[in-house]
Design a protein with these regions (language model features):
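Domain-level signature for soluble enzymes in the chorismate/prephenate branch of the shikimate pathway
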Residues: 1-280
Length: 280
C-alpha cells in the first residue's frame, strides 16, 4: 500500500487529488498541517510519496512550494490537474434560515465571493482548511455555522449540502505535483513514458541571457509550458527561473538540457514525468 503525505485533512482537495491520481490503488494518507511536514515525511521515510499543490488557474502559483521543492532533495514523478468545485454545507438540522456564519479557507471564500454577496447576512470566517471547517462543525455540533468545502468533505463528515457548485469561476483548476525519493522514481514512473520536465536555474546578469536559453529549447523543439521567476534572497536583481517543458523525444530533450547548461548557473532537474490528466 502506498503512503501519501498531503497537506490538509481527509476530505481536502489534496486528498481528492491523491485518490484520483492513484485511482484503483489502495493508499494510506499521511495528513500534515504544513507543506514542510510533507517533505519531512518523505525525508524520514524514503518509501513515502508526497502530493502538493503548485499552481491554481485563479490564485496563481504557490511560490513557497517551489522553494521547498528545490531544497527538498525529492523528485517530481507525476502531476494531476483537479477541477476545483465548492459546496456550502451545514449540520443536518440547520438550513438557510438558521445559519449565520460561513467558515472556510480564505482562498475558498475569495473564490465564492459572488455567491456570498447574495447572502450578505452571513458572516465570513477564515479558517486554515476547507475540510477542516467541515470537520469542526460536525465534531463540535456547531449549530448555525456553515462551511465551504468540496461536497466529498461534506459527505465524509455527515453534513448536509445546501448548494453545490457555488464557485464564481466554473473553470477553476489546481495542479498538484507528486514527489518522491529519487531512488524510488523509476518504480513510480518509467522514464521512457515521460514527456514533461520541470527544471530550475539562474542566469548570469547579462543582456539576453534568458532569450538565449529559450532559443536553444526552441531549436530542439522543446515546448515551454510555464516559466516562473523568484528572486534570489541576498542577490539583488538576480532570479531563479522555474521552467516546465514538454517533449516527445527523450533523447532530444536530454540534448537540449546539455546545450543550455553552459549558459545557466546551478541548473537542476526537479523531475521528469508524464503530463497529468485533468479531472472534473
Amino acid at each position: 500500500m502506498k503512503r501519501i503525505a498531503i497537506q490538509g485533512l481527509t476530505g481536502s482537495f489534496h486528498d481528492i487529488a491523491a485518490h484520483l491520481y492513484f485511482e484503483g490503488e489502495q493508499i494510506q494518507l499521511i495528513c500534515c498541517s504544513t507543506f514542510e511536514q510533507v517533505f519531512q515525511n518523505i525525508k524520514q521515510d524514503p518509501t513515502a510519496i508526497g502530493m502538493l499543490a503548485i499552481e491554481n488557474t485563479i490564485a496563481g502559483s504557490l511560490l513557497h512550494n517551489y522553494e521547498l521543492l528545490r531544497d527538498s532533495g525529492t523528485t517530481i514523478v507525476g502531476e494531476h490537474k483537479l477541477h476545483i468545485t465548492h459546496s456550502i454545507c451545514c449540520l443536518p438540522e440547520d438550513d438557510w434560515d438558521t445559519i449565520t456564519e460561513v467558515h472556510s479557507h480564505p482562498v475558498a471564500l475569495m473564490q465564492c465571493r459572488q455567491f456570498l454577496a447574495q447572502h450578505p447576512t452571513l458572516k465570513n470566517v477564515e479558517a486554515e482548511d476547507t475540510a477542516g471547517s467541515a470537520k469542526m462543525i460536525a465534531e463540535g455540533q456547531k449549530k448555525g455555522w456553515a462551511a465551504i468545502c468540496h461536497a466529498e468533505a461534506a459527505r465524509l463528515y455527515g453534513l448536509k449540502v445546501l448548494e453545490d457548485h457555488i464557485e464564481d469561476n466554473k473553470h477553476n483548476f489546481t495542479r498538484f505535483l507528486v514527489v518522491s525519493n529519487p531512488n524510488k522514481a523509476d518504480m513510480l514512473r518509467p522514464l521512457t513514458e515521460t514527456n514533461k520536465s520541470s527544471i530550475v536555474f539562474s542566469l548570469p546578469h547579462e543582456e539576453g541571457s534568458l532569450s538565449h536559453v529559450l532559443a536553444i529549447l526552441s531549436f530542439y523543439k522543446i515546448n515551454l509550458t510555464k516559466i516562473q521567476s523568484l528572486p534570489i534572497i541576498g542577490h539583488e536583481w538576480e532570479y531563479l527561473f522555474y521552467v516546465d517543458v514538454m517533449y516527445d523525444d527523450l533523447t532530444r530533450y536530454r540534448q537540449s538540457i546539455d546545450a543550455i547548461i553552459p549558459l545557466t548557473k546551478d541548473l537542476k532537474i526537479l523531475g521528469e514525468y508524464k503530463d497529468g490528466r485533468q479531472t472534473n
